Amino acid sequence: MLSRRIIPCLDVRDGRVVKGVKFRDHIDMGDIVELALRYRAQGADELVFYDIGASPEGRSVDYTWVERVARLIDIPFCVAGGIGDVETARAVLHAGADKISINSPALGRPQLISELADAFGVQCVVVGIDSIREEDGQWRVRRYTGDPSKTQALPMRTLDWVAEAQRLGAGEIVLNCMDNDGVRRGYDIAQLRQVRALCRVPLIASGGAGEMQHFADVFDQADVDGALAASVFHSGAIPIPELKRFLRAQQIEVRDGQ
């Protein structure tokens, strides 16, 4: 496996970075570009930006901040939010994003994954999956999680959707474990291991990081390709240079950074 990736996640609403707990109660965390520059300087491997209101509000992402970020950072970044067709994806990539991520629009029209893969190559197409464990013990997907008033519970099992997304051309999967989001108690290793067993493309863990050991655990125990986190990076609780030194000390290969 290639070096593991450390990926700050920036949820965007009204031109600002916000963060919630379990996709609820978002608070302002700062300016998009300022945070992007901070993470670039600290040695982040890439960035993910989620315009969390775009899909629930039926609009596309705001290209102006995508262009601002692209002008100022030289690490890869992925943009998600309201990308429901090839032309919108093309505009986001033209604005400077390296990858686009789709979530709710793909649940409504799965063929979108194939259309994007055919147009831009699988390396550009990330499928984000918001997953929650239900009372019967099954993990199932949620839609429109950026707006609590519009969130939809779907009958589709998470594992089935992972398999289908791959078949259609997803080049990477980001698994957002909603039960763990923002609570800082560790990644959902059990769920990630099940997804890893059937996921042939790069798998990124999201939701639950609270301390450096949580990153080591998810790499060692779930064999994910990257770990995404937000609140511990935004708050400064885990500086990325220290995290990379910690992981190297545990014989986990990470990319060079500070």
Swiss-Prot record:
CDD domains tied to this protein: HisF (cd04731)
UniProt EC number: 4.3.2.10
Enzyme class: lyase
Record keywords: Amino-acid biosynthesis, Cytoplasm, Histidine biosynthesis, Lyase
GO cellular component, one term: cytoplasm
GO biological process, one term: L-histidine biosynthetic process
Residues in coiled coil: none
NCBIfam families per record: hisF (TIGR00735)
The protein's name: Imidazole glycerol phosphate synthase subunit HisF
Organism: Xanthomonas euvesicatoria pv. vesicatoria (strain 85-10) (Xanthomonas campestris pv. vesicatoria)
Taxonomic classification: Bacteria, Pseudomonadati, Pseudomonadota, Gammaproteobacteria, Lysobacterales
Encoding gene (name): hisF
